[in-house]
């Protein structure tokens, strides 16, 4: 069993039940899924760029990404409806906990001038969004093989009803929030 999942079952549920006075252990919020999205605007001119992004995302998450397509045509960007412009991965279960563990323990501390992640990036429904400026913070990415530095969005979807519950859940998992 994964380290974070084990921690959730032993410590985290206990701490949250004490703090929020839940009547049942089933009320305790948990992480439902993690969505990693990489928008590749350059893919409009050069489709090889998207292949590199898909490959990198697969290395980072350990799962084959879904290629996202444009919903609308935008003439200014020379974009047609249905053109591939990004990639996303939805992680659940074991892979989700492995990715979160790697993100918290290895990747985030590798960010330059890292002070902690923002406390205000919750959406009001208990979900947390995190933007990463470069894919090089992940240990799987080889610096020499990277053609272009790309960022990505990471959305952590929880079953928490409020932002406060979600913040407490992620803090118990060891998410380094800014002081």
Swiss-Prot record:
Keyword RNA-binding appears in the UniProt entry: yes
Signal peptide positions on this chain: none
GO biological process: translation
GO CC annotations, alphabetized: ribonucleoprotein complex; ribosome
Molecular function in Gene Ontology: rRNA binding; structural constituent of ribosome; tRNA binding
Keyword list, A-Z: Ribonucleoprotein, Ribosomal protein, RNA-binding, rRNA-binding, tRNA-binding
Top-level taxonomic group: Bacteria
Record note on quaternary structure: Part of the 50S ribosomal subunit; part of the 5S rRNA/L5/L18/L25 subcomplex. Contacts the 5S rRNA and the P site tRNA. Forms a bridge to the 30S subunit in the 70S ribosome.
Described purpose of this protein according to its UniProt entry: This is one of the proteins that bind and probably mediate the attachment of the 5S RNA into the large ribosomal subunit, where it forms part of the central protuberance. In the 70S ribosome it contacts protein S13 of the 30S subunit (bridge B1b), connecting the 2 subunits; this bridge is implicated in subunit movement. Contacts the P site tRNA; the 5S rRNA and some of its associated proteins might help stabilize positioning of ribosome-bound tRNAs.
Family indicated by similarity: Belongs to the universal ribosomal protein uL5 family.
Protein name in UniProt: Large ribosomal subunit protein uL5
The species this protein was found in: Staphylococcus haemolyticus (strain JCSC1435)
């Amino acid at each position: 069993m994964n380290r974070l999942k084990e921690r959730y079952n032993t410590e985290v549920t206990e701490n949250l039940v004490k703090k929020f006075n839940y009547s049942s252990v089933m009320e305790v919020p948990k992480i439902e899924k993690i969505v990693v999205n990489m928008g590749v605007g350059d893919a409009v001119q050069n489709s090889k760029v998207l292949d590199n992004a898909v490959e990198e995302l697969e290395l980072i998450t350990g799962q084959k990404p879904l290629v996202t397509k444009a919903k609308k045509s935008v003439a200014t960007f020379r974009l047609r409806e249905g053109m591939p412009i990004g990639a996303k991965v939805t992680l659940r279960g074991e892979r989700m906990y492995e990715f979160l563990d790697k993100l918290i323990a290895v990747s985030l501390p590798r960010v330059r001038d890292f002070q902690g992640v923002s406390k205000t990036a919750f959406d009001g429904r208990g979900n947390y969004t995190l933007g990463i400026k470069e894919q090089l913070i992940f240990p799987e990415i080889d610096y020499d093989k990277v053609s272009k530095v790309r960022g990505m969005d990471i959305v952590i979807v929880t079953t928490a009803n409020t932002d406060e519950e979600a913040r407490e859940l992620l803090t118990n998992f060891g998410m380094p929030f800014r002081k």
